[in-house]
Protein backbone atom coordinates (compact mmCIF):
# COMPACT_ATOMS: atom_id res chain seq x y z
CA UNK A 1 0.00 0.00 0.00
CA UNK A 2 1.07 3.59 -0.45
CA UNK A 3 2.97 5.29 2.34
CA UNK A 4 1.62 8.34 4.13
CA UNK A 5 3.51 10.65 6.46
CA UNK A 6 1.54 12.67 9.01
CA UNK A 7 3.30 15.76 10.39
CA UNK A 8 1.22 17.18 13.24
CA UNK A 9 2.23 18.59 16.62
CA UNK A 10 -1.12 17.73 18.25
CA UNK A 11 -0.52 14.15 19.46
CA UNK A 12 -4.22 13.28 19.73
CA UNK A 13 -4.98 14.41 16.17
CA UNK A 14 -1.83 12.72 14.87
CA UNK A 15 -2.95 9.37 16.35
CA UNK A 16 -6.55 9.81 15.18
CA UNK A 17 -5.35 10.34 11.61
CA UNK A 18 -2.89 7.44 11.87
CA UNK A 19 -5.69 5.10 12.97
CA UNK A 20 -8.00 6.26 10.17
CA UNK A 21 -5.34 5.70 7.51
CA UNK A 22 -4.06 2.38 8.90
CA UNK A 23 -7.64 1.04 8.89
CA UNK A 24 -7.57 1.60 5.13
CA UNK A 25 -4.26 -0.30 4.92
CA UNK A 26 -1.96 2.65 4.29
CA UNK A 27 1.56 2.45 5.69
CA UNK A 28 1.83 5.41 8.07
CA UNK A 29 4.84 7.29 9.44
CA UNK A 30 4.28 10.08 11.95
CA UNK A 31 6.27 13.10 13.07
CA UNK A 32 5.56 15.76 15.69
CA UNK A 33 7.19 18.62 13.77
CA UNK A 34 8.93 19.50 10.54
CA UNK A 35 12.42 18.69 11.77
CA UNK A 36 11.40 15.16 12.77
CA UNK A 37 9.51 14.73 9.48
CA UNK A 38 12.51 15.63 7.38
CA UNK A 39 14.70 13.26 9.40
CA UNK A 40 12.22 10.39 8.88
CA UNK A 41 11.27 11.10 5.25
CA UNK A 42 12.20 8.34 2.79
CA UNK A 43 11.27 9.03 -0.86
CA UNK A 44 10.97 5.30 -1.60
CA UNK A 45 8.39 4.81 1.17
CA UNK A 46 6.34 8.02 1.38
CA UNK A 47 3.85 8.87 -1.38
CA UNK A 48 1.71 11.41 0.49
CA UNK A 49 2.71 13.94 3.16
CA UNK A 50 0.00 15.47 5.34
CA UNK A 51 1.43 18.42 7.23
CA UNK A 52 0.09 20.86 9.74
CA UNK A 53 1.38 24.34 8.97
CA UNK A 54 1.85 25.93 12.39
CA UNK A 55 4.33 23.82 14.37
CA UNK A 56 7.43 24.32 16.47
CA UNK A 57 10.86 23.76 14.92
CA UNK A 58 10.42 23.51 11.13
CA UNK A 59 6.91 24.63 10.15
CA UNK A 60 4.71 23.02 7.53
CA UNK A 61 5.59 25.54 4.83
CA UNK A 62 9.24 24.53 5.12
CA UNK A 63 8.22 20.86 5.03
CA UNK A 64 6.34 21.45 1.78
CA UNK A 65 9.31 23.20 0.16
CA UNK A 66 11.83 20.56 1.25
CA UNK A 67 9.67 17.55 0.33
CA UNK A 68 9.08 19.09 -3.11
CA UNK A 69 12.88 19.13 -3.56
CA UNK A 70 13.39 15.58 -2.24
CA UNK A 71 10.49 13.94 -4.09
CA UNK A 72 8.71 16.17 -6.63
CA UNK A 73 6.08 13.48 -7.28
CA UNK A 74 4.98 13.31 -3.63
CA UNK A 75 1.43 14.44 -2.98
CA UNK A 76 1.25 17.15 -0.32
CA UNK A 77 -1.76 17.98 1.84
CA UNK A 78 -1.60 21.04 4.10
CA UNK A 79 -3.85 21.23 7.15
CA UNK A 80 -4.31 24.24 9.39
CA UNK A 81 -6.74 26.00 11.65
CA UNK A 82 -5.81 29.25 9.93
CA UNK A 83 -8.40 28.89 7.18
CA UNK A 84 -8.29 30.32 3.66
CA UNK A 85 -9.27 33.90 4.44
CA UNK A 86 -6.94 36.66 3.39
CA UNK A 87 -3.95 36.83 1.08
CA UNK A 88 -1.52 35.98 3.88
CA UNK A 89 -3.25 32.85 5.14
CA UNK A 90 -1.08 29.82 5.74
CA UNK A 91 -3.27 27.56 3.60
CA UNK A 92 -3.03 29.99 0.69
CA UNK A 93 0.75 30.16 1.12
CA UNK A 94 0.87 26.35 1.19
CA UNK A 95 -1.02 26.22 -2.12
CA UNK A 96 1.40 28.68 -3.67
CA UNK A 97 4.35 26.59 -2.47
CA UNK A 98 2.98 23.48 -4.17
CA UNK A 99 0.54 21.75 -1.82
CA UNK A 100 -1.76 19.52 -3.86
CA UNK A 101 -4.62 20.04 -1.41
CA UNK A 102 -5.41 22.20 1.60
CA UNK A 103 -7.84 21.32 4.37
CA UNK A 104 -8.98 23.72 7.06
CA UNK A 105 -9.37 22.46 10.63
CA UNK A 106 -11.60 21.17 11.99
CA UNK A 107 -12.26 18.31 9.58
CA UNK A 108 -13.39 14.70 9.80
CA UNK A 109 -10.71 12.01 9.44
CA UNK A 110 -12.84 10.47 6.69
CA UNK A 111 -12.50 13.71 4.67
CA UNK A 112 -8.72 13.46 4.85
CA UNK A 113 -8.71 9.76 3.96
CA UNK A 114 -10.88 10.55 0.92
CA UNK A 115 -8.49 13.31 -0.16
CA UNK A 116 -5.52 10.91 0.12
CA UNK A 117 -7.40 8.38 -2.00
CA UNK A 118 -8.24 11.02 -4.63
CA UNK A 119 -4.65 12.25 -4.87
CA UNK A 120 -3.31 8.72 -5.32
CA UNK A 121 -5.83 7.72 -8.01
Task: Please annotate each region the language model reported.
Residues 8:
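Conserved acidic carboxylate
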Residues 62, 83-103, 110, 114:
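Alpha4 helix (beta4-alpha4-beta5 surface) of REC/receiver domains from two-component response regulators
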Residues 25-32, 40:
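Short hydrophobic/Thr-rich beta-strand motif most characteristic of the beta2 strand and flanking loop
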Residues 55:
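Receiver (REC) domain active-site loop signature in two-component systems and cognate sites
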Residues 52:
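Active-site residues of response regulator receiver
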Residues 15-23:
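Charged docking surfaces used in two-component/phosphorelay signaling
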Residues 79-81:
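Hydrophobic/aromatic residues positioned on beta-strands within the core alpha/beta folds
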Residues 33-36, 59-62:
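Acidic catalytic/metal-coordinating carboxylates
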Amino acid sequence: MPGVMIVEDDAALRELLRDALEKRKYTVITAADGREALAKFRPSVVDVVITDLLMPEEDGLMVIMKIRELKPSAKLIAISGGGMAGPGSYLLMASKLGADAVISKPFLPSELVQKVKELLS
